[in-house]
Amino acid sequence: MNLSLLLFLIGILGFILNRKNIILMIIAIEIMLLAITLLVLMSSVSFDDIAGQTFSIYIISIAGAESVIGLSILVAYYRLRGTISLRT
């Protein structure tokens, strides 16, 4: 539980501190989602419940789809602006 909390806090710090870089923001969001998945997985193992393990697989697949959508938006943004920096 402490490991997942530490990973989630690292993800939040990465998201807050890297507001200008879109790629690092996407990576920070992925770290937060994987921390939540780890917490669900550890809870399901401790309670001997298969539903939590199934739900963790579902979370991982949603996180993968989210990263694909985010990176495709990033490619479209790069083609439009010529840079991935968020500075206005």
UniProtKB/Swiss-Prot annotation:
It catalyses: a ubiquinone + NADH + 5 H(+)(in) = a ubiquinol + NAD(+) + 4 H(+)(out). The keyword Transport applies. GO terms for cellular component: mitochondrial membrane; NADH dehydrogenase complex. InterPro entries: NADH_UbQ_OxRdtase_chain4L/K (IPR001133), NUOK/Mnh_C1-like (IPR039428). It is a multi-pass membrane protein. Coiled coil: none annotated. One of its GO terms (molecular function) is NADH dehydrogenase (ubiquinone) activity. Its main location: mitochondrion. Keywords: Electron transport, Membrane, Mitochondrion, NAD, Respiratory chain, Translocase, Transmembrane, Transmembrane helix, Transport, Ubiquinone. GO terms for biological process: ATP synthesis coupled electron transport. This is NADH-ubiquinone oxidoreductase chain 4L. The lineage of its organism: Eukaryota, Fungi, Dikarya, Basidiomycota, Agaricomycotina.
